[in-house]
């Protein structure tokens, strides 16, 4: 889910990813189960 994704990004970037990715793309939650478009 989005929280797990945020934890992964925090580990990689050492910053909070939710403010950016919240509008960047829906990974899970709002629109159900979707794949990231960039990956």
UniProtKB/Swiss-Prot annotation:
Signal peptide boundaries: none
Cellular localisation: Secreted
Claim: Mitochondrion is one of the keywords in the record: no
InterPro entries in the cross-refs: PLipase_A2, PLipase_A2_dom, PLipase_A2_dom_sf
Cellular component aspect of the GO annotation: extracellular region
Family: Belongs to the phospholipase A2 family.
Official protein name in the record: Phospholipase A2 CS24a
